[in-house]
Structures are given as structure tokens and as C-alpha cells.
Swiss-Prot record:
Family to which the UniProt record says this protein belongs: Belongs to the geminiviridae protein AV2/V2 family.
Effect annotated for changing residue 84 to S: Complete loss of suppression of silencing and interaction with Solanum lycopersicum SGS3
GO biological process, one term: symbiont-mediated suppression of host innate immune response
Name of this chain's protein: Protein V2
Amino acid sequence: MWDPLLNEFPESVHGFRCMLAIKYLQSVEETYEPNTLGHDLIRDLISVVRARDYVEATRRYNHFHARLEGSPKAELRQPIQQPCCCPHCPRHKQATIMDVQAHVPKAQNIQNVSKP
């Protein structure tokens, strides 16, 4: 179990509450399989708590709440049928292809320029 006395404390009471909320949500997250809707929703809720400003937190919460209200409780522990593949989302791992070379610009032949 995580011991708050052995770790660095946030500077404010609000930060401390957020830290405890995140630790609690992480323990709840462990009860869901990684490819389930419930796991995805808990990750969204953690991102709400971690948001730096009010506007961003409100935007994330509204998105989370809409997804939660549109999901039946029976589906929370069921595997997600279509996994998210958004490129900007850090929690979704993109499949990597190791045999494809990185983009390397081709060399161009330049005419010999000499001074007159």
C-alpha cells in the first residue's frame, strides 16, 4: 500500500486531495482488465483530476460524464469492441513496425557551381 508519510507532499490541501484521489482511482483501476470500458473510463477520470486548470478539467469531466451516462453498467467490465487508435492519446499504445525505416530524405545531385 502507498504510504503518504514516505513520499513528498504537495504544497496545498487541494493538491493533497488530488493526490489521494489519484491513488484511490489507481487502485480501482487495477480491478478492471486493461481492455475494458471501465478501465478506460477510470483513466479518463484520472486525467480530469490531473488537469492543471479549471477550464481543461471541466472539458475533460464533461467528456467523461457523457461517456459514463451513455454506457450501461453491464458493459463496464466487457472488452471494448473497437479499441481507440487516436494518435494523440498517450494511454493507447500504437503498434510499431520495426522493419520499416524512418523517413530519410533522398540525396539530390547539385550542379557544380564555380566562381567566375
